C-alpha cells in the first residue's frame, strides 16, 4: 500500500495571515493566501499527523435543507480514529495529490477535490449549491493542532441523502435547536460550527 500524502500549509503561514481560535468567518482572506501557488504542498500523512509545525487543510462540509442540518454518528472504521462515536454535522476529508498533478493546489482544483470527497462519502439525490462560510482552528487538542478546517455550506433541494461509507452512520436532519440540545455529544469542530450557526 502506497504512503498517503495530504495537503498542508506551514504553520508560520497561518500565523502570518492571522492565527485564531474557534470560527473565523473571513474565509476568503485566508483562502486567497492558502491556495496561492506554492503556499500549499503535499506531505506524508504519518508525518503530518504528529507535526504541529504544519496544518492539514481539511474541507468540512455542512448540509442544509429546509431549516435542518445533516447530522450523523462517526462509525468505528476509517477516518480519524480520535473522533469515533462522536456526532458530527460535517463531512471532512483530506485532499490528496490525485486531485492535482502539480505539487500544490489552486482554488479550482481545491474545489474539485471537495466535490470528489463528497461524492465518495455521500449519495445526494437532487441538486445542491455550496459556498465557503468560514474556517475552523482548534489548538486545544491534538487533533486540532495539526488541522485547519475550511467550512463549506451545501444547500440541498432534497433531504434524500445516504451514506457511502461505514464511518458515516445514522444520518438524519435536525433543526439547529435540536442540534444545540445535543451539543455535548458533538465533536469539537461541529460544536464550533453549531455555535456559529446559532448566532449567524
Describe the predicted segments one by one:
Residues 1-168, 174-200:
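N-terminal leader/linker segments that precede catalytic domains of diphosphate-processing enzymes
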Amino acid at each position: 500500500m502506497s504512503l498517503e500524502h495530504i495537503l498542508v500549509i506551514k504553520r508560520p503561514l497561518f500565523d502570518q495571515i492571522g492565527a485564531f481560535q474557534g470560527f473565523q468567518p473571513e474565509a476568503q482572506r485566508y483562502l486567497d493566501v492558502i491556495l496561492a501557488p506554492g503556499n500549499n504542498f503535499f506531505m506524508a500523512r504519518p508525518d503530518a499527523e504528529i507535526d504541529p509545525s504544519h496544518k492539514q487543510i481539511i474541507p468540512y462540509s455542512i448540509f442544509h435543507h429546509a431549516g435542518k442540518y445533516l447530522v450523523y454518528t462517526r462509525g468505528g472504521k476509517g477516518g480519524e480514529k480520535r473522533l469515533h462515536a462522536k456526532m458530527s454535522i460535517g463531512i471532512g476529508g483530506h485532499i490528496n495529490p490525485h486531485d492535482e498533478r502539480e505539487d500544490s493546489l489552486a482554488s479550482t482544483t481545491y474545489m474539485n477535490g471537495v466535490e470528489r470527497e463528497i461524492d465518495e462519502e455521500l449519495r445526494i439525490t437532487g441538486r445542491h449549491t455550496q459556498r465557503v462560510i468560514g474556517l475552523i482552528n482548534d489548538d486545544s487538542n491534538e487533533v486540532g493542532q495539526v488541522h485547519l478546517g475550511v467550512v463549506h455550506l451545501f444547500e440541498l433541494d432534497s433531504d434524500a441523502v445516504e451514506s457511502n461509507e461505514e464511518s458515516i452512520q445514522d444520518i438524519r436532519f435536525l433543526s439547529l435547536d435540536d442540534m444545540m440540545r445535543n451539543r455535548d455529544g458533538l465533536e469539537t469542530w461541529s460544536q464550533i460550527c453549531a455555535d456559529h450557526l446559532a448566532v449567524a
